[in-house]
Every structure is written in structure tokens, then in C-alpha cells.
Amino acid sequence: MEQLKILFLCHGNICRSPMAEFIMKDLVRSRGLQDCFLIDSAAVTTEEIGNAIYPPAKRKLYEKGIPFDDHRARLITKKEIEDYYDMVLVMDISNLWYLRRILGVEPGPKIRLM
């Protein structure tokens, strides 16, 4: 079975997108569907690259019992968007603007604004 590859994008990949990634992974795992999905997150800007999840975000995941790993912020690439992910969920309109700059064109149908 081919996995549906879902990517969450936000500004720095230290708060919203990794939280969405780990919440979605937990939801999928709780339903026994982890083999059906590949879930990831990334940033649309470079300023937080290499940084860990924002401590208050990490604390909230812990409080809610949502497992997370030693995530480090990373920058999305045009190639990943075009050739790898099936669905890209962008956190806000500003992130969509940055994504347009990365892609060099208007985002296609696999891009969704949350």
C-alpha cells in the first residue's frame, strides 16, 4: 500500500507545524493507520533551522500525552513539494506567500491553507 505523504508548513518549524505533525501522527497511530501515512513538517523561512521545538509547544504536547521526538527545524525545498508530498498544509497566508517564493509559481492543488 502506498502511503499518503502529508507535510505541515509554518514559518519556522518550531511551533505550529511540528505540533500539527505530532498530533496527526498520534491520531493516525491511535487508529492503527500509521502504515498508511507519512507525516512530516518543515519551515518556509531559514531563521529557526536546526532549532528544537519551542519549549511551550513541547510542554503542551507533553501535557496532552502526545508523543514527540527530538525534532529539529528544517527548510522545505521546491523539489520536495513538487515531487514527494501528496498534500501540503500551510498554517497561514503569510506562510503561503513564502511558499510562493520558494516555488516560483502559484501553489498547485496539493497545497491547502489551514
Q: Which role fits each region the language model picked out?
A:
Residues M1-Y84:
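Conserved active-site segments centered on acidic
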Residues Y62, T77-M114:
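Glycine/proline-rich loop-helix segments at beta-alpha junctions forming the active-site rim
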